[in-house]
């Protein structure tokens, strides 16, 4: 089973991000707007309950996190991916660090860059055109997220689904 952890914003916040994703993101139908906290990792089906218990344990005393998407940015030249950059707060960094350790299914492959992807799967020309447009429009989305979501990849439907949520209280 392929699972991961993410912060998923409210429907209204998702609608704002999806306004761009519908047009520019080849993965739009596979996953909702999110901030990845723990990238996908593989477990056996019988390990799911212990993973859930470990997530609960690690989140003890951890409160809601403020999310502020401040501008369009990109991973170019590494990838032609455009995203809304989220201000990296101590709380977001701490949350990421709680779950990206050897004793919880391994270290992160990449440094933590909190963001909402809005465009991917682009040619270089598409990237240049779209990035210029999105950068001019700007973004200022704020929200307090009060739960961490556990997602599972559904191979039959070729999409990620929330299978559990954990209160940040």
Swiss-Prot record:
The reply on keyword GTP-binding is no
Enzyme Commission code: 3.1.-.-
Q: Where is this motif: HXTX 1?
A: 34-37
Broad EC category: hydrolase
One Pfam family, short name please?
2_5_RNA_ligase2
Q: What GO MF annotations does this protein's record show?
A: hydrolase activity, acting on ester bonds
Chain location of the short sequence motif HXTX 2 per the record: 115-118
Does this UniProt record's set of keywords contain Hydrolase?
yes
- Please give the InterPro entries that the UniProt record associates with this protein: 2H_phosphoesterase_YjcG-like, Cyclic_Pdiesterase, YjcG
- Keyword terms: Hydrolase
Q: Any idea which residues are catalytic in this one?
A: 34 (proton donor), 115 (proton acceptor)
Superkingdom of origin: Bacteria
Looking up PANTHER family in the UniProt record yields: PHOSPHOESTERASE SAOUHSC_00951-RELATED (PTHR40037:SF1), PHOSPHOESTERASE YJCG-RELATED (PTHR40037)
What HAMAP family does UniProt report for this protein, alphabetically? 2H_phosphoesterase_YjcG
Family assignment from sequence similarity: Belongs to the 2H phosphoesterase superfamily. YjcG family.
Q: What is this protein called?
A: Putative phosphoesterase SH1944
